[in-house]
A protein has these predicted regions:
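Short helix-capping segments at alpha-helix termini
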Residues: 1-5
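C-terminal interaction segment
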Residues: 7-75, 82-127
Length: 127
C-alpha cells in the first residue's frame, strides 16, 4: 500500500475494531486496513474499517465464514478476505456494488477491490 502512495494503514492483531462505535463491543481481526484516519483513536478503529482479513483455523470456520461475514457486511466493511492455510485458499468478499465473492489459491494474484491496481499473491508473502 505504501509503495503505491496509499493513504491506508495496515494494523495486525491485536487491534480493536469497534464496529458499532459503542466503546464496549469490539472484534480483533487478524489484519485490519483503515483508509480514513478519522476513524482511529488510542483504542483502535471506531466504525467499519475498509478491509479486514481473517485467517481461519479449524475451530473458527463458523465464526469466520458465517458470523463475522454477516457482522462485517452489515457494519459497512468494504472488503473481507478469509485466508484458509489448510486448503491454501482465499475467499474474498467485496460488499460494495455487486457484492461478489471469489475464491483464489495462494498462487493467484488476488486483486484488492478497495485499491485499484493493487493485488497480492499470498505465496509470495509466505516465501
Amino acid at each position: 500500500i505504501a509503495d503505491n502512495k496509499g493513504a491506508c494503514e495496515v494494523y495486525p492483531a491485536p487491534f480493536a475494531v469497534f464496529l458499532n462505535q459503542d466503546d464496549k463491543t469490539y472484534v480483533e481481526p487478524d489484519v485490519t486496513v483503515v483508509c480514513d484516519a478519522d476513524r482511529l483513536d488510542d483504542k483502535g478503529c471506531n466504525g467499519a474499517p475498509d478491509w479486514i482479513v481473517e485467517i481461519v483455523s479449524p475451530g473458527s470456520y463458523r465464526m469466520d465464514y458465517l458470523i463475522k461475514l454477516f457482522k462485517y457486511r452489515t457494519a459497512g466493511v468494504k472488503e473481507y478476505w478469509i485466508v484458509n492455510p489448510v486448503k491454501e485458499t482465499v475467499q474474498t468478499y467485496f460488499f460494495e456494488g455487486n457484492e461478489d465473492s471469489m475464491q483464489y489459491s495462494f498462487e493467484d494474484e488476488i486483486p484488492v477491490s478497495i485499491y485499484s491496481g493493487f493485488s497480492i499473491r499470498i505465496s509470495a508473502l509466505l516465501a
